[in-house]
From Swiss-Prot:
Positions in the Lumenal compartment: 52
Localization of this protein: Endoplasmic reticulum membrane
GO biological process per UniProt: apoptotic process; protein glycosylation; protein N-linked glycosylation
Biological pathway: Protein modification; protein glycosylation
Protein name: Dolichyl-diphosphooligosaccharide--protein glycosyltransferase subunit DAD1
N-acetylserine found at: S2
Transmembrane segments: 31-51, 53-73, 93-113
Record's subunit section: Component of the oligosaccharyltransferase (OST) complex. OST exists in two different complex forms which contain common core subunits RPN1, RPN2, OST48, OST4, DAD1 and TMEM258, either STT3A or STT3B as catalytic subunits, and form-specific accessory subunits. STT3A complex assembly occurs through the formation of 3 subcomplexes. Subcomplex 1 contains RPN1 and TMEM258, subcomplex 2 contains the STT3A-specific subunits STT3A, DC2/OSTC, and KCP2 as well as the core subunit OST4, and subcomplex 3 contains RPN2, DAD1, and OST48.
Alphabetized Pfam families for the sequence: DAD
PANTHER family attached to this UniProt entry: DOLICHYL-DIPHOSPHOOLIGOSACCHARIDE--PROTEIN GLYCOSYLTRANSFERASE SUBUNIT DAD1 (PTHR10705:SF0)
InterPro entries found in the cross-reference section: DAD/Ost2 (IPR003038)
Intervals, Cytoplasmic compartment: 2-30, 74-92
Task of the protein: Subunit of the oligosaccharyl transferase (OST) complex that catalyzes the initial transfer of a defined glycan (Glc(3)Man(9)GlcNAc(2) in eukaryotes) from the lipid carrier dolichol-pyrophosphate to an asparagine residue within an Asn-X-Ser/Thr consensus motif in nascent polypeptide chains, the first step in protein N-glycosylation. N-glycosylation occurs cotranslationally and the complex associates with the Sec61 complex at the channel-forming translocon complex that mediates protein translocation across the endoplasmic reticulum (ER). All subunits are required for a maximal enzyme activity.
Organism whose genome encodes this protein: Pongo abelii
Length: 113
């Protein structure tokens, strides 16, 4: 059982490293960073508490929203999904990401107070 799991993981990593464009790898690293930041905030909330509750909610909502926007960007700029997003260039998708991210962070900063 564990040998098959190891072989599946090694094959996944091999194919990911060989066939994924550099642009998507960079975006995946950003997604991992956001995921770890959100997990760290949630762990801190469980261990220490949520005294400044608005601050915790703002940070966590920022992580979740940024993750969702980045996944949307990754889906749109993936070359395998080009047929689904014919009218949207990668530059347009990135501009949409920047605009939505700016709005998200303005709302988050307003929520902090």
């Amino acid at each position: 059982m564990s040998a098959s799991v190891v072989s599946v993981i090694s094959r996944f990593l091999e194919e990911y490293l060989s066939s994924t464009p550099q642009r998507l790898k960079l975006l995946d690293a950003y997604l991992l960073y956001i995921l770890l930041t959100g997990a760290l905030q949630f762990g801190y909330c469980l261990l220490v508490g949520t005294f400044p509750f608005n601050s915790f909610l703002s940070g966590f909502i920022s992580c979740v929203g940024s993750f969702i926007l980045a996944v949307r960007l990754r889906i749109q700029i993936n070359p395998q999904n080009k047929a689904d997003f014919q009218g949207i260039s990668p530059e347009r998708a990135f501009a949409d990401f920047l605009f939505a991210s700016t709005i998200l962070h303005l709302v988050v900063m307003n929520f902090v107070g």
